[in-house]
């Protein structure tokens, strides 16, 4: 079950009006009066333990000839809870993304690529969802990340949502795949946070690079 912090944050989001949040994917403009009023109301922001960066891999920018990961671009880096919500409430959620899109949220200065030194010896847990059914679990995953809810939080690199024709996949990337104790703990906690009942598997990045889709799960929970 998602923890109380995640529930409270989700309820706050649900209770906000459409005017407060803006339409899906719309970047909401501000009048001078609105900006001034907000500046007076928000006197203190709540810093996160880590800064995080959203990355987007646009399907229209992908090419079979291009190197993997060459079309991934950083979108925004945030370091407070308020800045997270400001960005999250004004971007498309997974159900509204185009097929082929990949949206990432990684600790700042860690690129969502196998080649990144922090990710190089890591791996990933993956959850599968029917098309259009991952929005809430994606939000809960983000809240667990930025809220430092994992016991082995230092192992976390970030998360990615992959939108495909028949399904959506959320993957949680970690840095030290060989640390079975840490990886199993992360997998179990992630399932609890999202109230996810199906078995999930952990694949080493090294296996994925060598075997592609033939790579097998090293751990399962």
Swiss-Prot record:
Region (Disordered): 1-36
Keywords on record: Cytoplasm, Disulfide bond, Host-virus interaction, Initiation factor, Nucleus, Plant defense, Protein biosynthesis, RNA-binding, Translation regulation
Record's subcellular location: Nucleus; Cytoplasm
Basic and acidic residues bias spans: 1-20
Reported consequences of knocking out the gene: Slightly impaired growth and fertility. Plants lacking both eIF4E1 and eIF4E2 display pleiotropic effect on plant development but are resistant specifically to several potyviruses including potato virus Y (PVY, strains N605, LYE72, LYE90 and LYE84), tobacco etch virus (TEV, strains HAT, CAA10 and S103), pepper mottle virus (PepMoV), Ecuadorian rocotto virus (ERV), pepper severe mosaic virus (PepSMV), pepper yellow mosaic virus (PepYMV), and potato virus V (PVV). Plants lacking eIFiso4E, eIF4E1 and eIF4E2 exhibit a semi-dwarf phenotype.
Region (EIF4G-binding): 46-49, 56-92, 140-149
Modification after translation: According to the redox status, the Cys-119-Cys-157 disulfide bridge may have a role in regulating protein function by affecting its ability to bind capped mRNA.
Free-text function comment from the UniProt entry: Component of the protein complex eIF4F, which is involved in the recognition of the mRNA cap, ATP-dependent unwinding of 5'-terminal secondary structure and recruitment of mRNA to the ribosome. Recognizes and binds the 7-methylguanosine-containing mRNA cap during an early step in the initiation of protein synthesis and facilitates ribosome binding by inducing the unwinding of the mRNAs secondary structures. Key component of recessive resistance to potyviruses. (Microbial infection) Susceptibility host factor required for viral infection (e.g. potato virus Y (PVY) and tobacco etch virus (TEV)) by recruiting viral RNAs to the host ribosomal complex via an interaction with viral genome-linked protein (VPg).
Protein name: Eukaryotic translation initiation factor 4E-2
Source organism of this protein record: Solanum lycopersicum (Tomato)
UniProt lineage: Eukaryota, Viridiplantae, Streptophyta, Embryophyta, Tracheophyta
């Amino acid at each position: 079950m998602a923890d109380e912090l995640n529930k409270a944050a989700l309820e706050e989001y649900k209770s906000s009006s459409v005017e407060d949040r803006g339409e899906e994917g719309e970047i909401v403009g501000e009048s001078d009066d609105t900006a001034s009023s907000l500046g007076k109301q928000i006197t203190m922001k709540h810093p996160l333990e880590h800064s995080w960066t959203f990355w987007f891999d646009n399907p229209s920018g992908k090419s079979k000839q291009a190197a993997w990961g060459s079309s991934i671009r950083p979108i925004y880096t945030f370091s407070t809870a308020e800045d997270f919500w400001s960005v999250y409430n004004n971007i498309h959620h997974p159900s509204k993304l185009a097929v082929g899109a990949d949206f990432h949220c990684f600790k700042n200065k860690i690129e969502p690529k196998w080649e990144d030194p922090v990710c190089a010896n890591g791996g990933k847990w993956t959850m599968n969802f029917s098309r259009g059914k991952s929005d809430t679990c994606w939000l809960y995953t983000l809240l667990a990340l930025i809220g430092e809810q994992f016991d082995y939080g230092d192992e976390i690199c970030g998360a990615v949502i992959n939108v495909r024709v028949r399904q959506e996949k959320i993957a949680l990337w970690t840095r030290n795949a060989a640390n079975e104790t840490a990886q199993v703990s992360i997998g179990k906690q992630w399932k609890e946070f999202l109230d996810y009942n199906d078995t999930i598997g952990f694949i080493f990045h090294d296996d994925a690079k060598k075997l592609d889709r033939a790579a097998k799960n090293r751990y399962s929970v």
